[in-house]
Amino acid sequence: MPIQIEVCIDNLESLHNAINGGADRIELCSSLALGGLTPSFGFMKKAAAISSVPVYAMIRPRQGDFLYDNDDISAMIEDIHAAKLAGLQGVVFGVLKANGDIDMPLSTRLMKIANDNDLGVTFHRAVDQCSNYKKAIENIAELGCERILTSGLAANAYDGMTVLNDMVKLANGRFKILAGAGVTAENAKEIIEKTGVTEIHLSGKSTRPSKMKLMLDGVKMGAGDLDDFIVPVTDSKKIDAVRQNIK
C-alpha cells in the first residue's frame, strides 16, 4: 500500500508548495506555531478551489488544552458546517474530558455533524494527552474516525515509535494511524518501517524573507520573539525529499 503524505499548512503559499512537493492530503490550519487552529472560511474556500488533493480543516477554536466549554463547541459545530460549505473533504478535531478521557458525548455529536455533511474525520493529537491511549483507541473506533493523528504520546513521532507500533496493532485495520510531529526526510522511512503506519504527517517547514521594501523596527504584531519580516512556509523540496526517501 502506498504511503500517504499529509502536509499541514497555514497559508496559501504553503498550499501550492505542498501540492507541488507531492502531498496526498492537506491539513488546513491557522497558526501552526500554536499547534494549528481553525482556518478562516475564506481560507477554506480558496484552498478548496486551488487544491488537487483532499483538504481537511482543523477544528480547534483556541490554543491550549482540549477541554472545551459550550461556546467553544458551538463554534466548532459552525466551523464543521463551514468546511462543508467551503467545499472541503474533511475535518480534524479532538475533545477531552477533564480527566484525560475522550469526551464521547461531545465527540459523538461532532462526528454526527461531520457525517451528515459527508466529511471525513481525523481525530487529532488530543489523543497524545489522553489518560489511556489503549482505551482511546477503542473510543475512536466506536466513533468511526478515519484516522488518528499522533506522535505516539511522545514529543515527536521518532521518539514515539514503540507506542505508534502498538497503536497500529490495536487499531487492527479499523482506522489509520497517522504519524506526525518531527517527521523529516531523514527519519520518515525508519518511522514507517518500525511502526507499520501507512500515513505520515509533516509541515516541511521553512521560512522566506518578507518582500516588503520598508521594514520598520520596534513595532511588533505579536510576540516579541517573532520576526514580522520572516514568513513561515512549506518547502516543496522537503516534501518531495520525504516522498523520494520512502519509496
Swiss-Prot record:
Mention any one GO cellular component term assigned to this protein in its UniProt record: cytoplasm
The main location is cytoplasm
The source's domain of life comes to Bacteria
Q: Which InterPro entries match?
A: CutC-like, CutC-like_dom_sf
Which keywords does this chain's UniProt record carry? Cytoplasm
The keyword Cytoplasm is assigned to this record: yes
The terms under GO molecular function for this entry are: copper ion binding
Cellular localisation = Cytoplasm
Q: Which family does it belong to?
A: Belongs to the CutC family.
Name of this protein: PF03932 family protein CutC
According to its UniProt entry, this protein's organism is: Aliivibrio salmonicida (strain LFI1238)
